[in-house]
From Swiss-Prot:
Residues 504-538 have a biased composition (Acidic residues). The keyword Membrane does not apply. InterPro entries: EIF3A (IPR027512), eIF3a_PCI_TPR-like (IPR054711), PCI_dom (IPR000717). One of its GO terms (molecular function) is translation initiation factor activity. Keywords: Coiled coil, Cytoplasm, Initiation factor, Protein biosynthesis, RNA-binding. It comes from the Eukaryota. This is Eukaryotic translation initiation factor 3 subunit A. Residues 502-546, 836-942 are annotated as: Disordered. It comes from Vanderwaltozyma polyspora (strain ATCC 22028 / DSM 70294 / BCRC 21397 / CBS 2163 / NBRC 10782 / NRRL Y-8283 / UCD 57-17) (Kluyveromyces polysporus). Its main location: cytoplasm. It holds the Pfam family PCI.
Length: 942
């Protein structure tokens, strides 16, 4: 079967005609029907693309996103089987995005221009006349352009990006188009600050990547190959751009997820990204860590960035100075980590992002910044700050030193982001230093000594919070007396624990005494149960089992730790912070030893269990054979017993079935009899439960007795009920009569009071409204003359303006009318000339057709005559050969043949016909007339 005929030009022409008459929706629908027709499968995609482009342009103008999405998917489904089908899909997708972005830019520019025009006239437009006009003009908007128009186009643009991404996703032949659309979508979100759309875009890209990973194990055409370096690099570039846009939009959670995506893709990739790309990645990573308060990782990231930036050929000394200073400043801003810690670190995943095996320390970061290639570029002011904080730290002079250095630091743009972290570090160092020199100090004096100058200062309330945080993290041990506003520093970490232990022991003793009192009361109330009392006395004579709580366990461990540390000389003379550090290190060492012991015990237990398991398996193999024989014998016996039991059960079930059938038949007959009785119109009814176990005869007797009993009972109840009803009704009416009269009097009085109140309220309200209206009337009478004069002046001004405008518009209308008349007249003249030309051409074509028909008819007649002549001449020649004719006869025949050839040549020339562009032939070469042809024919016959 031949493929259907496609005429794309006709579809575009039809759409243009509909658009020209204002039927854009119909034009769009006609193009949609053409694109989604099945005959598109047989066409070359290049011939259909102009129709798709026209459809996209028209659909974007009309904002028919759903229709466009459906048409694109249908188009992809129809053409993807052809050779260049997917390439055409990519071109169509790019064209769609171009149309949408162009339209979006145009709408946004138009809205901005409208906003600028209205902003220019905001001050000059507020006049008394405009205020009066605003009373009767409904549209009083002064907010600039209509934001809803731009918002609707933003939504349409976003949905268009989503539709295209869904169209080209996870296809190896559309990877470049997919990457380009992803980049343009991210730029759209960044340009118009679309945070929610960017989050959904990032989630969509992750789903696409997950689907691509899932397809790696499948077999199919056009599957994305993630093992290809170019494909993986494209995905990696998308994630780098995603991270960059996340940071610019300040979507920190989304930025962190993008960092994880980049990390996993870099692990999959065999090639290292470019240094500039990695430098940008680490710069964004540092911003994310700064926002998440991961100061150590922030410093480590800046160090990696600096190493990559050193290979930049365009780097300047100022850049090295800036970035090296940031590394040292961020290291100084890292919180103190003097005390060792154990346990799970929630930031372990973040360490792996930077290739770190464990958590780095603050000192390591500072030493990292002190490396020669970094330290030589650091700003002198930052070096002075480092010397003040780490080398020459003195709590008494640090305030003045910082105050002298702070103005220079504030002049540096990168210092502002580390102010809070530096403040916390300095305050904690001050608190630790004061805890070593002071025992008890007033709170105001403490805060004055620990406070910092300038932007590093804090109010007392926030300083107290930092002090409590330092105590929580065990850098100081304090006791705050709010009555005397005094802070007491403890020098020994076990001192406050021992005090707390004494308090806890007293509370436990009180609880035990209360428990004994309660037990005594229960014993007094339980004298009636002698046996239980004796058992209770026997239990009391026994020693109570010790109850170990979590608090007791911790207290005992701390007491043991205290005894161990008291034997160390360095512990006695150390400061509080050094004691805490030594205690933690000792406790960690002991815990590690105990954990190692437990691991060793568990390994020994596992070895013994493994050996026992091997022994058991060896003996189990022998027992398995014996058990198999026993089981086989038991199975045969059970099978025989089961068959015998099945036969007995089958016989029993057959007997029971017969009995059930007989009982069912009997019950159906009884139920039928009962139903017929219950259908009759009488009061007595019989339930199925009443006739359980009775036969038909007994049921009939029961029915007769029920009917007799029901009849007598009904008569008695009717008589009694009538008497009761008569007496009760009379009694009710007598008793309620005085109550009804009393209620009527009270209701009458209540209604009269309500009426009087309502009447007075109506009169008062009417009087108040009248007075208010009279006041308004008196006020308006005073300004009425001014209002009339202003109205007349405005009316006169507006009428004069409108007269000028009307005159101008009338002149313009007349000029346009004359121009239109001339244009229509000229157009009609041209149409008439064109019609006349067409008629003349039609007549000429008709005349030429008639001449050609006549020529063909004459040519046919000449061919027939020539054929007859040739047959006759051939016969005559044969006869002359047989008879041996003379020379004169042969010469005559030659002349006839020559003339015949001339006739045939003339017929051929006539059949070819004269060309329209050729000139008229001369008389010498003209065709023979009909009379000349007849003479030649007669001569040939002779």
């Amino acid at each position: 079967m031949a493929p259907p005929v496609l005429r794309p030009d006709n579809a575009i022409k039809r759409a243009d005609e509909l658009i020209s008459v204002g039927e854009s929706q119909a034009a769009l629908q006609s193009l949609y029907e053409y694109l989604t027709a099945r005959k598109i499968r047989f066409a070359q995609p290049s011939t259909v693309e102009p129709i798709v482009f026209k459809f996209l342009e028209l659909g974007v103008d009309l904002k028919r996103g759903r229709l466009i999405k459906d048409a694109l998917h249908q188009y992809k489904k129809l053409v993807q089987g052809s050779q260049d089908g997917l390439s055409s899909v990519g071109a169509v997708a790019r064209k769609f995005i171009d149309c949408v972005e162009t339209k979006m830019a145009f709408e946004h520019l138009k809205a901005e221009e409208s906003q600028t025009e209205e902003d220019d006239d905001l001050e000059g437009g507020v006049t008394p006349e405009n205020l009066l006009k605003s009373v009767y003009i409904q549209d009083q908007s002064v907010a600039g352009f209509n934001d809803e128009v731009v918002t609707s186009w933003l939504k349409f643009t976003w949905e268009s990006y989503r539709a295209v991404l869904d169209l080209v996703r996870n296809n190896s032949q559309l990877e470049i188009t997919y990457a380009g659309v992803v980049n343009r979508t991210m730029q759209f979100c960044l340009k118009y600050n679309r945070k929610n759309e960017f989050k959904r875009l990032a989630e969509m890209l992750r789903q696409h990547l997950d689907a691509a990973n899932y397809q790696q194990s499948k077999i199919g055409s056009n599957i994305v190959d993630l093992s290809d370096s170019e494909t993986l690099q494209r995905y990696l570039d998308q994630r780098f751009l995603q991270l960059n846009v996340s940071v610019k939009l300040e979507l920190w959670h989304e930025a962190f997820r993008s960092i994880e995506d980049v990390y996993h893709l870099m692990k999959m990739s065999k090639h290292t990204p470019k240094s500039s790309t990695l430098a940008n990645y680490y710069e964004n990573l540092a911003k994310v860590f700064l926002i998440s308060n991961a100061q150590l990782l922030h410093t480590a990231t800046w160090e990696k960035f600096y190493r990559l930036y050193q290979s930049n050929p365009n780097a300047t000394e100022e850049d090295f100075k800036k970035y090296s200073s940031i590394i040292l400043l961020s290291a100084l801003s890292t919180p103190l980590d003097i005390l060792p810690t154990v346990g799970y670190d929630p930031q372990m995943r973040l360490y792996r992002l930077l290739g770190l095996e464990s958590r780095p320390t603050r000192n390591e970061m500072i030493e990292l910044a002190k490396q020669e290639d970094i330290y030589k570029h650091i700003d002198e002011d930052i070096i002075k700050l480092y010397e003040i904080m780490e080398i020459n730290y003195n709590a008494d002079t640090i305030k003045t030193e910082i105050a002298a250095l702070l103005p220079k630091l504030e002049a540096k743009p990168y210092f502002k982001q580390y102010i809070n972290q530096l403040r916390n570090v300095l305050l904690r160092k001050n608190y630790v230093s004061l805890s070593e020199t002071e025992n008890a100090i007033p709170t105001d004096a403490l805060y004055d000594k620990a406070s910092l100058p300038g932007v590093l200062s804090l109010p007392h309330w926030d300083m107290e919070k930092t002090l409590l945080q330092a105590a929580v993290e065990d850098y100081v041990s304090i006791s705050i007396d709010h009555d005397s506003n005094t802070v007491t520093f403890f020098k020994d970490p076990f001192e406050i624990i021992s005090k707390a232990a004494g308090t806890v022991e007293e509370e436990e003793e009180e609880e035990e005494e209360e428990g004994e009192e309660v037990e005594g009361e229960e014993a007094e109330t339980g004298e009636e149960i002698v046996e239980e009392g004796e058992e209770h006395e026997n239990e009391e004579n026994k020693e109570p089992e010790p109850v170990i709580t979590r608090t007791t366990f911790i207290r005992n461990r701390l007491a043991e730790l205290s005894n161990v540390l008291e034997e160390i000389d360095a512990f006695k003379n150390a400061s509080y912070l050094e004691k805490v550090k030594l205690a933690r290190e000792t406790l960690i060492t002991q815990t590690k030893d105990s954990i190692e012991n437990l691991k060793q015990i568990a390994e020994d237990r596992a070895k013994r269990a493994q050996e026992q398991k091997k022994k058991y398996m060896a003996s189990a193999a022998v027992r398995a054979e014996e058990d198999a024989e026993i089981r086989q014998r038991q199975i045969l016996e059970e099978k025989a017993a089961l068959e015998a039991k099945l036969e007995q059960d089958a016989h029993r079930r057959l007997v029971e079935k017969k009995k059930r059938e007989f009982e069912d038949l009997k019950q159906r007959e009884i139920q039928k009899f009962i139903d017929e009785f219950n259908k009759k119109d009488h009061a007595a009814k019989i339930a199925s439960e009443e006739v359980q176990g009775l036969d038909i005869k007994e049921i009939k007797t029961l029915i007769f007795s029920k009917l007799s009993q029901d009849k007598s009972e009904l008569e008695d109840r009717m008589t009694s009920s009538l008497q009761k009803l008569d007496h009760a009704e009379r009694a009710y009416r007598k008793s309620e009569l005085p109550l009804l009269r009393k209620e009527a009097e009270s209701l009458k009085e209540t209604d009269m009071n309500k009426f009087n109140d309502m009447k007075s309220k109506i009169v008062d309200t009417a009087r108040a409204e009248f007075d208010a209206k009279m006041e308004d009337h008196n006020r308006l009478v005073g300004v009425y003359n001014d209002y009339v004069s202003l109205k007349d002046r405005l009316t006169t001004t507006v009428e004069e303006k409108f007269k000028l405008i009307r005159a101008e518009n009338a002149a313009k209308f007349e000029a346009a009318k004359k121009a239109r008349i001339e244009e229509v007249r000229k157009q009609r003249y041209e149409e008439l000339v064109a019609e006349r030309k067409a008629e003349i051409e039609a007549e000429e074509r008709e005349e030429r057709a008639k001449k050609q028909e006549e020529t063909a008819r004459k040519q046919k007649e000449m061919e027939e005559a020539a054929e007859r002549k040739s047959k006759a001449s051939s016969a005559a020649a044969a006869k002359s050969i047989l008879t041996g004719g003379n020379d004169a006869r042969s010469a005559k025949l030659d002349e006839i043949a020559r003339r015949q050839r001339e006739i045939e040549q003339a017929a051929e020339r006539k059949a070819q016909g004269p060309s329209a562009s050729t000139e008229a032939p001369d008389d010498e070469g003209r065709n023979l007339t009909y009379a000349e042809k007849m003479k030649l024919r007669r001569a040939s016959k002779k």
